[in-house]
Amino acid sequence: MASLKDVAKLANVSLMTVSRALNNPERLKPETLARVQQAIEQTSYVPDLSAKKIRGAHASPKTIGVLALDTVTTPFSVEITLSIEETARMHGWNSFVMNMFTDDNPDTIVDLLLSHRPDGIIYTTMGLRQVPLPAKLLTLPCVLANCESIDEQVASYIPDDEQGQYAAVQALLAEGYRQPLCLHLPADHLATTRRRQGLERACREAGLDPDTLEHSYMASGDEHYRDI
């Protein structure tokens, strides 16, 4: 991650000048300010909001920054963030959550997250999905929770939807049910495809054609349960 010194070196100015550009830009000449701002953009520098530390103080615990995309809407998603915090504390780490919503500017939220200088990142979402990863996140150790990266090779911790559905349908068929109603998440959800694979595997192992069952796909959230 770029430092204040990197910006100063690229702009060919002093550290004080960079500091003034960030905190008191009106005190600089327009051409100097423009040069510093260009260097900040080129180095992807993010100001350090946690820099006010007493010199010589004991090292503070390491910190995990949790970037939470649409994960404050259900008990399941809240449980994810609470579990992260509890596990971090068990190992002597701190954690903080930065919420991001679909209409937010990702670059702005990521810059705010990184300005707190976390030692690592957990990117979590509500509902299993594939996500694009802002390049700045990959300047730190980063893992994904309940989501997968579209392009980058990043460790992901996700539910085993295929195996879970397989076990559930297998148990149902073992009780003698041969015509269960199959209620699915919306067809375009990533978890839907994997759960359908588990269902089909369990049915075929039991000699049952899954295509003969009645399948209904949710269209607009929980309201579809009432329709059925």
Tell me the role of every PLM-derived stretch.
Residues 41-42, 49, 83-94, 137-144, ...:
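Bacterial carbohydrate/catabolite-sensing allosteric modules
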Residues 66, 117-125, 181-184:
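Periplasmic-binding protein-like
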Residues 105-119, 224-228:
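Short, well-structured alpha-helical segments in soluble
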Residues 1-15:
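Extreme N-terminal segment that seeds HTH/winged-HTH DNA-binding domains in transcriptional regulators
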Residues 1-2, 41-75, 91:
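N-terminal helix-turn-helix/winged-helix DNA-binding helices
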Residues 36:
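Short conserved active-site loop signatures built around small residues
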